[in-house]
Amino acid sequence: MAGITKPQPQKGNESAAGEAVAASAYNGLTQQPGNACAPGSGQNAHANAADADDARGKPSTFANSAGAGCEHDADDARFMRRAIELAWRGAGWTNPNPLVGCVIVREGRVIGEGWHERYGQAHAERNALADCARRSGQGASGQPASPDDPAHGCAQGATAYVTLEPCCHTGKQPPCTEALIAAGIARVVVGSRDPNPLVAGKGCEALRAAGIRVDADVLRAACDELNSVFFHFITHKTPYVVAKWAMSADGKIACASGDARWITGPEARADVHELRHRLAAICVGIGTVLADDPLLTCRRDTPGSQPVRVVLDSRLRIPEDCALVRSCSEGAAALVVATCAPVADEASPEAAKAKRLASRGVEVLSVAPDAAG
């Protein structure tokens, strides 16, 4: 953060330094023992060894979701890597959905590609099938193909490489399994299993029941890394929290005098804004607000999504003229202030302040105090 100052003990878990970010679909952080937020690692040894084989072009054997062994070769690994690259393009835009990429191949040639681009919009498989139609000239340029015949037959007999098991239920979008079956796909290569109880193997089962060959766990470690937070939330029903702070090489987070100054460089600050783009919410204590007057918005070189901004403020001390409140009035990202102050007591000054904040677009969330206040 800009202007990080020496933290002072606060009640109600309020800190003047650092920020915590709760994610529903952040990508690229995986958990390791003793290091809760280590980038790009923490996968199981079997999967890592398999990926190493892929890098050398050797076939690797995995157990598929039916319990039988399946093999994949260097081509399978190559096309799955491309699907992973595509999936990353949705980072920050698909919350709370997972990141998914899909590549459709016939006779060693890519005939369609797609990824889940935005929450509520078409999934990766349907986008890839629509791309098949566009490339073949059977679909209107820039327009999605028919959900009933997503590739207009041009993907008949092809192989689909998908980073996550295709969905088989109806939500904001129809099942991807139906689209793959209708398109005449002959083989589906899956990276990650979907732990969502609505899928959880049922997608692969539906494809097999339709006569489609399904090979699972291809580059599973890399595919799992795409959705470490989605998997955590689905499995544990709790937010995946990333702690971020600025620290000097000798382990200090502020000057001895306590005055605020930059201790991070432009690369680190750019990384922070990339985090904010990819995460669903950002949380700070009132100490940070009082010391730094931050905006907590995503300010990348290219447009990014904006996380919900959360302030832990046990006594409702947030200044009404601070940057957070002003930006909320100007239509910036949502702002939630969690407080233990007696905002329900109409006669209290805190209740009047809460009403003024609400009139400016701030959501004041009343929570019961814990033992520490």
What are these regions (language model features)?
Residues 2-75, 134-156, 344-347:
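Intrinsically disordered, low-complexity terminal tails and inter-domain linkers enriched
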Residues 104-222, 308, 340-346, 363:
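Zn2+-dependent cytidine deaminase-like catalytic core
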Residues 75-95, 233:
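Short, basic/aromatic recognition patches
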Residues 227-238:
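Flexible, polar/acidic helix-loop-strand segments at domain edges
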Residues 142, 147-150, 232, 242-249, ...:
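Active-site ligand-binding patch in enzyme domains
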Residues 100-106, 245-246:
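Short beta-strand scaffold segments in enzyme catalytic cores
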Residues 96-99, 240-241:
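Short, small/polar residue-rich loop motifs at catalytic or cofactor-binding pockets
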Residues 158-168, 236-247:
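N-terminal pre-triad scaffold of radical SAM enzymes
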